[in-house]
UniProtKB/Swiss-Prot annotation:
Coiled coil: none annotated. One of its GO terms (cellular component) is membrane. Residues 9-86, 95-167, 182-260, 275-350, 365-442 form the BAG domain. It comes from Homo sapiens (Human). Expressed in the heart. GO terms for biological process: Golgi organization; negative regulation of neuron projection development; negative regulation of oxidative stress-induced intrinsic apoptotic signaling pathway; negative regulation of proteasomal ubiquitin-dependent protein catabolic process; negative regulation of protein refolding; negative regulation of protein ubiquitination; protein folding; protein stabilization. This is BAG family molecular chaperone regulator 5. One of its GO terms (molecular function) is adenyl-nucleotide exchange factor activity. It comes from the Eukaryota. The gene is BAG5. The fifth BAG domain is responsible for the interaction with HSP70 nucleotide-binding domain. It is linked to Cardiomyopathy, dilated, 2F: A form of dilated cardiomyopathy, a disorder characterized by ventricular dilation and impaired systolic function, resulting in congestive heart failure and arrhythmia. Patients are at risk of premature death. CMD2F is an autosomal recessive, early-onset form. The keyword Repeat applies.
Amino acid sequence: MDMGNQHPSISRLQEIQKEVKSVEQQVIGFSGLSDDKNYKKLERILTKQLFEIDSVDTEGKGDIQQARKRAAQETERLLKELEQNANHPHRIEIQNIFEEAQSLVREKIVPFYNGGNCVTDEFEEGIQDIILRLTHVKTGGKISLRKARYHTLTKICAVQEIIEDCMKKQPSLPLSEDAHPSVAKINFVMCEVNKARGVLIALLMGVNNNETCRHLSCVLSGLIADLDALDVCGRTEIRNYRREVVEDINKLLKYLDLEEEADTTKAFDLRQNHSILKIEKVLKRMREIKNELLQAQNPSELYLSSKTELQGLIGQLDEVSLEKNPCIREARRRAVIEVQTLITYIDLKEALEKRKLFACEEHPSHKAVWNVLGNLSEIQGEVLSFDGNRTDKNYIRLEELLTKQLLALDAVDPQGEEKCKAARKQAVRLAQNILSYLDLKSDEWEY
């Protein structure tokens, strides 16, 4: 269409649609709740655009009326998606679990850093249980839910790490103030750092409305400046004492994100954890083996070497340190399932090929089970390649195919044959495992 001759109302609708499009990704990725500032901001923008669309004069022309209708529908769709993201049952579940963590911190941790008793085993067990439950919240591959779960997990994991680090490595101090005039100042700073640790935890967990990340960062930086200004006169033990306190402050500073005060989780990234990196290394190699198998013209030549290497990868995963962290435990559990599923795929392929070589008379029911196993092998190959979420047509198709195989197995009558009964039971377990694996893959769990 010649833009110079385009009707002004159509041009205006296109401008509005462009503005609506500019916030679409923010809406899709919105991971907060309906009382968040960003929710209200996005809702306000979209509602304003709806009014703007409604005010466009169609002059009774059909093409303009249709264009206005389409623009309104797209804006309403985004408003609906924003509302659904904020009120999704699993988003509410994440928030409820987070509020449990807040109560735990309020009750057990804030008093501790205000001079109370030490952190209890009850707190450690409680926080681990909360993290574990969060790792099991299903996202269905939905971006907003994945973000919400990730942000909540990283905040709670940050608190866990701060506390464990503090309990594990208390500085070799305080030194006697008689040793040197600077010691009194270092002792004072150390007490301030302990208080700041409690403030930081309260900030991360949203239980302190009187402090900001920016202000706390300034306070901690000021404490480092005070320590740097001290004259320790070459005294090694005092210099070491000061260094330990500075290191403690720097550890706290890494959790503060000055660029986005509202999003403190960016400072804590579990993906940099040593155990997670080992798991990722194993998964990378597993994917390479999987791709080689699925793309090979004659995969049977790779079965033995691939299976041997995959079993070695299981051994490497067994050696991964869990560090009392449920996130790492969940990451390892998923990695073991990934590797084990590929081993099972090879085992079934080998069994099917062996059966072809040694064909013999068999019970009709047993033959029916083997036919289903052949189908399951083909479906499992597709599931291994699947990379989507539960709303994808391919997910639904694979789920239906697997359900059909389970129904086919249910229809098999073993007629009292024990061997057939055992084979059918094993085939049912395999089909259920493939379904579970498809579910796990579509969840797109993140660290």
